[in-house]
């Protein structure tokens, strides 16, 4: 049937900030949905609090609301925009939960649900209702019981044997779930799960540890046409969250009979749940001992796995699901890649591997064992002709300096057994190492329960290593076999060097391959195993078993101008969706100029790897071997390395030397900006202040240099992103401890030492330069003091406390740096304002993580403007082309946007709830996974919105617990006064309480944990504390501080860990009390105001 005509205006709900369990896969689905609905002529209204998304660009919707995703916001938008229907299935768990909250409020009126109706959502999401539905259609389920309090939960212990699986309902990424083995663990996890479930419901079921896990991506339409888009198999057995498991598509160890049973079961489940206009993900488990198959759960929406399945097959799941939601049937929808009907089930003739990316190194003390609660922050995908090739390419894609199955260290056999038995991010590497140590497939299966087929494949890779020595350089057949098995040039060189004590590089292997014509072949992802011609080139490389003909390896369309954009690889802390946003904008800008675009990336979650973002997509590891192969094939007229973060930037010099034309800022300039010594000399010549700094190549030299500079100092290794291993140290003892624990210092890896400007205000500046003119796009003032990583700091645009004269001075210094450095394109500079003196902290001649925020706040798409400048070289013309809202002031020497009549605030979002044992304290090492944006008429309201959107739900009244480190106690009176003025009662332990009382305010004294009961921990658990202000000395995560912060996370209590944000919070609470922050206004309205 054709599209629905009874609806005109559709509200699309986004997923909010990037968090563990919900990443940028929902920007991919949301962007596809918005584009599809607009093309069909619907009026699209969109809500999402995340500015770093493509879907929140003003052109993708008729009205874009960058607002907290709450029931109140949505009801206000529905009323204001006269919404006819809501599409909640493209924004993950966040969108489903809020949609159900709105539905249950009874205030929706005639507004319809698209994609999945409320009844279907309840059936799919409420574990008890889902269980009843499965029983009705004869599906097998784990033995289980539901509970709504601890007493009810205890009944399960009498009926189901340990170990027990506990799952919280309506949570994200397995939050509140886990396996318990005894009563102590049962009590702790049960109480946590009940607290985390928004409906205080938990499921207690028999453990399925060691069972095989599978997923089916299913689509169903109103006419009951059903297709399986993709089957996915988890290499890790049940017990590891599917988001943290290594997965394979298609499923490889199912028999045909098992597959057909699972396929039919999936269709029956969608029919019973009532999903008839979209896609769903259904998860199964199979007992390897007897073949018993049970249903685990289903998601009645587009999911993380949907994004993977879409990229694995080339089937546009989000677009098809959107079309189904508005009335089309599968046979009426055309597959954009092949032009065939969408009712054809995809067929693939290759193997896809997904490996999750973790960043445990950012969270000392966090539990790194993998379980049923998700912990990964990103993922990579690789495509190969065989499992061996695919898995080795995936390992190379992780950006962990892996060359494949690298050797890993272990203490002894018992340690190796422990590391294999307990799932962790390196488990497959330990499995490979165990084969090298003589373990059998049977022994390893008993330890890890990974299917013997996968273990055998890994063993064959390890066994083949024995054949790789210097003879491979002259043995064409052996070298070809190594390459068809996925061995990288780098790994082959390492193995030869290990055997024969040589010093071969990957280049040496490359030249041998070229001489022997062992060259990468590029194949298409086309959903049909080559049966139909692909209209959209989406490519991966493999080494064929026989020699290639030259025509098979050459790219077509050589006459067209084309530019290759290198993406950022897997999401991780320090390099996230913001960089993919810039890459996508680069592609759009090149298309605007008629340039053919080539996107190169390995992240399946992103918009950049969507089939219609660029003209050609290469899904390959971002390493030199694979980059070189694509550049040799395509021979692009330019390569952009500046938008994908540090990942592509580190290849600038090698690619330039190889002959690739880097457009924009040159490799020489990039290298100079990274060289601290050269760059310090450059800044000194310009007469710009910078903190005293030095480098050290040994511990003793570091101690000497730090003493000369004067404590406190900021220390870090060179060449880092996201402030990794960066720390403020206050004395020699702390410095020696840091040098011992955090870095490996040497002549090749010096440590950088900078004067730390205590209590300074940090400033972020984004600018664009064409060599003649400079556009200072945004001057952002950080809310938190200097010393907290810029990626973790909230910031305001325009600045709140920096006068116009100082802003002009900052703009001038930015222009001086950009013009003298030779920047062509984007530039980010971090300044610090200390005692009214401006200091330059850092310069990055590339896209920064604030580019999306500044673009949204000002209405100028900075990455698009910069791309145009990099290709055509004229900044003013590029600005005029994209200045839709007429915000640029062209009358000044240094170009700047006009001061807006509103305030924008960016706030960071953190993963502490998912990483038990980690501290909330912020510092120079970045720890946030995502961001939100608040826009309103003033700072107080904007900051209030940013706190609501980042899940720090500030109370309007109640008790504030204040605990300040000694250094901060002088500000006690100021903090106390602000919160007393708002009507809050104060509570504190000894020292801080005394300070508050002496300041003239009432304060309830509460015991420290070591002083008796009731103490502060009891008060937190009992819900007697409604807001916590807790500052502590760096790295003092112990005692009371540790217990306080663990309970803050467990009971979701709002908190501040530094004074400036606590003071900003007081202003926000005033706005919340007055309800002024609840006003909603679209981004388009703000930009036109």
UniProtKB/Swiss-Prot annotation:
Statement: the UniProt record of this protein carries the keyword Metal-binding: yes
Needed co-factor(s): Mg(2+); Mn(2+)
Residues reported to bind Mn(2+) 4: 842, 844
Residues the record lists as binding Mn(2+) 2: 297, 299
Stretches for region Oligomerization domain: 400-553
Binding residues annotated for Mn(2+) 3, in chain numbering: 830, 842
Record function comment: Large subunit of the glutamine-dependent carbamoyl phosphate synthetase (CPSase). CPSase catalyzes the formation of carbamoyl phosphate from the ammonia moiety of glutamine, carbonate, and phosphate donated by ATP, constituting the first step of 2 biosynthetic pathways, one leading to arginine and/or urea and the other to pyrimidine nucleotides.
Domain-related comment: The large subunit is composed of 2 ATP-grasp domains that are involved in binding the 2 ATP molecules needed for carbamoyl phosphate synthesis. The N-terminal ATP-grasp domain (referred to as the carboxyphosphate synthetic component) catalyzes the ATP-dependent phosphorylation of hydrogencarbonate to carboxyphosphate and the subsequent nucleophilic attack by ammonia to form a carbamate intermediate.
Name assigned to this protein: Carbamoyl phosphate synthase large chain
């Amino acid at each position: 049937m054709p599209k629905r005509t009874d609806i005109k205006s559709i509200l699309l709900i986004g997923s909010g900030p990037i968090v563990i369990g919900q990443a940028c896969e929902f920007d991919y689905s949301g962007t596809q949905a918005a584009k599809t609905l607009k093309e069909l002529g619907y009026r699209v209204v969109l809500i999402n609090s995340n500015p770093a998304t493509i879907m929140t660009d003003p052109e993708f919707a008729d009205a874009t609301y960058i607002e907290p995703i709450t029931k109140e916001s949505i009801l206000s938008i529905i009323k204001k925009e006269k919404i006819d229907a809501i599409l909640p299935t493209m924004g993950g768990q966040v969108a489903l939960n809020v949609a159900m909250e709105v539905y249950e409020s009874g205030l929706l009126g005639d507004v319809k649900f698209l994609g999945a109706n409320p009844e279907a959502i309840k059936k799919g999401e409420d574990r008890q209702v889902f269980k009843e539905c499965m029983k009705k259609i004869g599906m097998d389920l784990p033995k289980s019981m539901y509970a709504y309090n601890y007493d009810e939960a205890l009944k399960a212990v009498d009926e189901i044997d340990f170990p027990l699986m506990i799952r919280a309902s309506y949570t994200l990424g397995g939050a509140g779930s886990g396996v318990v083995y005894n009563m102590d663990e049962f009590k702790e996890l049960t109480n946590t799960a009940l607290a985390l479930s928004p409906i205080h419901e938990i499921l207690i079921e028999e453990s399925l540890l060691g069972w095989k896990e599978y997923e089916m991506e299913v689509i169903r339409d109103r006419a009951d046409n059903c297709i399986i888009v993709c089957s996915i198999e988890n290499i890790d057995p049940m017990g590891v969250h599917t988001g943290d498991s290594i997965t394979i598509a298609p499923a490889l160890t199912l028999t045909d009979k098992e597959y057909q049973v699972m396929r039919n079961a999936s269709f029956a489940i969608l029919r019973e749940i009532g999903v008839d206009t979209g896609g769903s993900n259904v998860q199964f488990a199979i007992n390897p001992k007897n073949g018993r198959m049970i249903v685990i759960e289903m998601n009645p929406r587009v999911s993380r796995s949907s994004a993977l399945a879409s990229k694995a097959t080339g089937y546009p799941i989000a677009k098809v699901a959107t079309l189904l939601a508005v009335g089309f049937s599968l046979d009426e929808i055309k597959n954009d890649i092949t032009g065939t009907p969408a009712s054809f089930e995809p067929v693939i003739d290759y193997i896809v591997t997904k490996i999750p990316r973790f960043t445990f190194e950012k969270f000392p003390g966090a539990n790194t064992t993998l379980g049923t609660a998700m912990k990964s922050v990103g993922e990579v995908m690789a495509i190969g002709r065989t499992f061996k090739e695919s898995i080795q390419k995936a390992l190379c894609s992780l950006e962990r300096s892996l060359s494949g199955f690298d050797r890993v260290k272990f203490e002894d056999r018992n340690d190796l057994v422990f590391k294999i038995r307990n799932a962790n991010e390196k488990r497959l590497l330990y499995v490979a190492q165990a084969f090298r140590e003589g373990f059998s497939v049977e022994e390893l299966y008993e330890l890890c329960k990974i299917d013997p087929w996968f273990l055998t494949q890994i063993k064959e890779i390890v066994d083949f290593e024995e054949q790789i020595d210097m003879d491979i350089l002259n043995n064409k057949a052996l070298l070809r076999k190594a390459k068809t098995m996925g061995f990288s040039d780098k790994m082959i060189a390492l193995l030869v060097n290990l055997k024969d004590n040589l010093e071969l590089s990957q280049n040496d292997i490359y030249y041998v391959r070229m001489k022997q014509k062992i060259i990468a072949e590029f194949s298409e992802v086309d959903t049909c195993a080559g049966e139909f011609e692909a209209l959209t080139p989406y490519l991966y490389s493999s080494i064929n078993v026989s020699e290639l003909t030259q025509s098979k390896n050459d790219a077509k369309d050589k006459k067209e101008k084309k530019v290759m954009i290198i993406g950022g690889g897997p999401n991780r802390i320090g390099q996230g969706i913001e960089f993919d946003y810039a890459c996508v904008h680069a592609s759009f800008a090149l298309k605007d100029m008629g340039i053919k675009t080539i996107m190169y990336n390995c992240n399946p979650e992103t918009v950049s790897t969507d089939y219609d973002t660029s003209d050609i997509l290469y899904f390959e590891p971002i390493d030199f071997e694979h980059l070189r192969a694509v550049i040799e094939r395509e021979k692009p007229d330019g390569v952009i390395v500046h938008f994908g973060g540090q990942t592509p930037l580190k290849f600038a010099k090698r690619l330039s030397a190889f002959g690739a034309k880097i457009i924009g800022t040159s490799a020489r300039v990039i290298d100079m900006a990274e060289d601290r010594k050269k760059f310090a000399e450059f800044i000194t010549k310009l007469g710009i202040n910078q903190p005293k700094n030095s480098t050290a190549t040994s511990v003793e030299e570091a101690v000497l240099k730090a003493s000369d500079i004067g404590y406190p100092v900021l220390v870090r290794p060179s060449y880092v992103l996201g402030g990794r291993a960066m720390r403020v140290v206050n004395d020699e003892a702390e410095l020696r401890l840091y040098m011992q624990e955090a870095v490996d210092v040497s002549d090749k890896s010096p440590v950088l030492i900078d004067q730390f400007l205590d209590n300074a205000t940090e400033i972020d500046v984004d600018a664009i330069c064409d060599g003649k003119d400079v556009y200072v796009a945004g001057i952002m003032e950080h809310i938190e003091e200097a010393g907290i990583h810029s990626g973790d700091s909230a910031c305001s645009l325009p600045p709140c406390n920096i006068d116009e004269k100082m802003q002009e001075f900052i703009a001038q210094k930015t222009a001086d740096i950009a013009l003298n450095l030779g920047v062509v394109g984007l530039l980010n500079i971090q300044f610090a304002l200390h005692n009214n003196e401006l200091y330059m902290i850092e310069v990055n001649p590339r896209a920064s993580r604030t580019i999306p925020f500044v673009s949204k706040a000002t209405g100028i798409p900075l990455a698009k403007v910069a791309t145009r400048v990099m290709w055509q070289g004229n900044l003013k013309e590029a600005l005029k082309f994209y200045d839709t809202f007429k915000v640029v002031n062209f009358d000044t020497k240094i170009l700047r946007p006009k001061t807006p009549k509103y305030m924008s605030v960016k706030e960071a979002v953190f993963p502490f709830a998912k990483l038990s044992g980690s501290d909330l304290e912020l510092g120079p090492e970045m720890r946030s996974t995502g961001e939100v944006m608040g826009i309103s008429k003033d700072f107080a309201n904007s900051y209030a919105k940013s706190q609501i959107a980042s899940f720090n739900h500030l109370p309007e009244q109640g008790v504030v617990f204040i605990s300040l480190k000694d250094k901060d106690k002088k500000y006690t009176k100021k903090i106390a006064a602000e919160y007393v003025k708002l009507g809050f009662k104060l509570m504190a332990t000894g020292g801080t309480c005394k300070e508050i009382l002496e300041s003239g305010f009432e304060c309830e004294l509460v015991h420290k944990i070591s002083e008796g009961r009731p103490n502060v921990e009891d008060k937190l658990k009992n819900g007697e504390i409604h807001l916590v202000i807790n500052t502590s000395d760096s790295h003092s995560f112990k005692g009371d501080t540790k217990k306080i912060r663990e309970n803050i996370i467990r009971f979701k209590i709002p908190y501040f860990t530094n004074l400036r944000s606590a003071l900003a919070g007081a202003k926000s609470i005033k706005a919340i009390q007055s309800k002024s922050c609840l006003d909603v206004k679209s981004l388009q309205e703000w930009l036109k105001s």
